[in-house]
Amino acid sequence: SDRLLEITSELLKMSQVESGKLYLNPKITKPIELIDYAIKANRVQAERFNCQIEVEYPEKITKLFVDSEKIAWVVTNLLSNAIRYSSENGRIIIGARQIDKAVEIYVKDFGKGIDSRYHESIFDHYFRVPGTKVQGSGLGLAISKDFVEAHGGTIHIESEVGKGSTFVVRFNV
C-alpha cells in the first residue's frame, strides 16, 4: 500500500508539470537544509540497508532561491535511489559545493553504476534500465528533472558500470 501511495503521488506531480500547473513558491534556502531534510526522510531506509551516509558541505556557500519543498523532494528522491541501488553496507556521499556562480547538490553512491548509453534515458518518464531488479515506477528521475528545470537548473549523472553513480543538481546563483 505504501508503494501504491508513492506511485500515485509521483503521477500527481508529473501531471502538474505536464499540464503547466506546476506552481513554484521560491524562497531563500540553505543547501544544507535540503540535504538534512533528505537524510531525515531516508533515515529508516538507510538503517534497513545498513548504509553509511557521509555529508560534504563547505563553510561558505551561496543560498539558493528555490521552492524548497520541490527541491527537497528531488534531493530526497536522489538519496533514496542511492540507498536502494547500493549494496547492503554501502556508502553514500551527499553534499553541496559552489563552483563559480553555481551551486551544486550531489549524491554519490558506490553501487553498480549505470551504463553510459542510458545516461540520458533515465530522465525520461517511465524509463527503467533493462535488467533492474530494484522496484520503481520510472518516474522519480523524470519528475526530479522537471522540478529542477522549472527552476532554471540542470540535473545530470556521472556514472560508470561497477563504480557507482553521482547525480548532480546545479543552480546558477
Task: Label each residue range with its predicted role.
Residues S19-L24, K63-V66:
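Conserved micro-motifs of the catalytic ATP-binding
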Residues I114-Y126:
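Short conserved segment of the HATPase_c
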Residues D2-M14, L34:
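Coiled-coil phosphoacceptor/dimerization helix of two-component systems
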Residues N89-K101:
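Short beta-strand/loop element within the Bergerat-fold HATPase_c
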